[in-house]
């Protein structure tokens, strides 16, 4: 049964591969691709900058840093007190 189903699928895939790329999928010229690289890099940089700024602002406005700082302070105080009592 599995072989019966896989043979038609294999034939369809083989036909698609042998057909080659469609005209719209054909590779563009190298010169036009090279001309677009600086624009693409600038766009990528701007997008990355915007996302980074948004992430930093979201972290600044959340209360996670304050909670983390308080937790570390409390834990440090507890450890410090335990060491004082243990070595006194």
Curated annotation (Swiss-Prot):
Subcellular location per the Swiss-Prot or TrEMBL entry:
Secreted
The answer on whether this UniProt entry bears the keyword Signal reads yes
**Region forming the signal peptide:** 1-26
Q: Which UniProt keywords apply?
A: Lipid transport, Secreted, Signal, Transport, VLDL
Asked if the keyword Secreted belongs to this entry, the reply reads yes
The record's annotation in InterPro entries points to: ApoC-1_sf (IPR043081), ApoC-I (IPR006781)
Name of the protein in its database record: Apolipoprotein C-I
